[in-house]
Amino acid sequence: MLITVRDPSPTLRCSSLNRRLIPTKHNLSPRLLRSSFRQHNLSLRLRSSSSSNLYTSCDLANFDPLGINPDLSSSSTWRNLLTIFQTSSQKDKPRGVAAAIEDSSIDFGDFFNGPLPGKFLKLLGFLALSRLGVYIPLGGVNRDAFLGNLDQNSLLTTLDSFSGGGIGRLGICSLGIVPFINAQIVFQLLAQVYPKLQDLQKKEGEAGRKKLLQYTRYASVGFAIVQAIGQVLFLRPYANDFTTEWALTSVILLTLGSVFTTYIGEQITELKLGNGTSLLIFTNIISYLPASFGRTFSQAFSDANYVGLVTIIVSFFLLVLGIVYVQEAERKIPINYASRFTSKSGGIEKSAYLPFKVNSSGVMPIIFSTSSLALPGTLARFTGLSSLKTAAVALNPGGSFYLPFNILLIAFFNYYYTFLQLDPDDVSEQLKRQGASIPLVRPGKSTATFIKTVLSRISVLGSTFLAILAAGPAVVEQTAHLTAFRGFAGTSILILVGCATDTARKVRAEIISQKYKNIELYDFDKY
């Protein structure tokens, strides 16, 4: 914008702009005045947006210092009122790339603009392949007799829900992803004992993580062989003709089925739509859900227990709401940065927060506790000792010692796994490197001690939540006199909710990332 002053009158000199543009003395030469105006005109061209506001306030036609003209005073009053009630987002609205970054809204059409439809088709194909192996049964087994024993074993019923009914159908993929999960758990524990494994995970970057993943694959094959042998020995009373050839063939088929399922899980992970292991378990639990609720409804209608049925349904929805609330709950610790640029304000941000999940360990403590309580039964099956059989009966779901031992083990594993995922010393060192600090806490050891105290208190809340989640369904069953949660306990619901929320975040992040790729850096008129 170009401002041209033709007559430097005394009236014009009283405005703030022209005090800077025009010298107060009139005895200057016309040549010097023209030079001064030329320089100011050049600077005003470069600042057109700010000069337009200055010109509006310094216009001769609007100059009314005594308020004689009522039209002008009223218009300026309305203009001032509009400015006061204007929101900060409208005042400081970012432009250009900053506006594109802040525009994180997602429309339904954004889903079809990128590669997400193709990824979802691949995901459905992989999940269908994983379910196909469940329906291919092992030969030579009396399935009806086996199912009668399966309904009486609560632990096997729970594992059957994780495999999507694969154990009950005696499918070749009945082991599922469980051997790979066991291998991951073992390597996570070994990483705390052997520093070399910890260096592979943290210091060697992507190459180290790939090498650790390769070790986990090898270990998962070993776990699959051991579990396949255990399953074949468990099926021995139900086999039509238990021979060495049948046992060897069954072990090979079960091992290959587990390896195939693990491969599918890794392919799903590469799609970046969620964790492949979690999505496989999610699919298996969803497939088991109709049968579980079908048995509940048939039992309720046959016994005319309608009050119990309503209690079960209400408890289920309350359980889902409670899980969603706790899964999204965070303990936010404020932190101050020395300096950090943000696109939201277009400047330097000096404060943020450090989020800690209330249930940061997820479902892993419950899985650890369930595996520990199942250990006496597994050993009793191999050894045949009467003492182990007695302990297994007491520690099975419904046993006298099941509930107290389950709560104690959940609390222990939750505390351990919380600090396994978040090392206070490591977090303190990272904050120090980034120039961040917690208010009223010194950097270094004091910060690590503060974070350890916060995590300890959070682990108490998380342990209480997981204990209620593990014991709640059993209490509801005893109150309603229905076995609705048999094989579909709070653990399964926690996995369902956690996997669904994680996949929703991944899909949203993928859509936003696709929008960022389409930003035209020099299309400022669009924003």
UniProtKB/Swiss-Prot annotation:
It is found in: Plastid, Chloroplast thylakoid membrane. This is Preprotein translocase subunit SECY, chloroplastic. Component of the plastid Sec protein translocase complex, which is composed of at least SECY and SECE. Its main location: plastid. The gene is SECY. Belongs to the SecY/SEC61-alpha family. GO terms for biological process: protein transport. InterPro entries: SecY, SecY/SEC61-alpha, SecY_CS, SecY_dom_sf. PANTHER family: SECY/SEC61-ALPHA FAMILY MEMBER. It is a multi-pass membrane protein. Keywords: Chloroplast, Membrane, Plastid, Protein transport, Thylakoid, Transit peptide, Translocation, Transmembrane, Transmembrane helix, Transport. It comes from the Eukaryota. The central subunit of the protein translocation channel SecYE. Consists of two halves formed by TMs 1-5 and 6-10. These two domains form a lateral gate at the front which open onto the bilayer between TMs 2 and 7, and are clamped together by SecE at the back. The channel is closed by both a pore ring composed of hydrophobic SecY resides and a short helix (helix 2A) on the extracellular side of the membrane which forms a plug. The chain crosses the membrane at residues 120-140, 170-190, 219-239, 246-266, 273-293, 306-326, 360-380, 393-413, 458-478, 480-500. One of its GO terms (cellular component) is chloroplast thylakoid membrane.
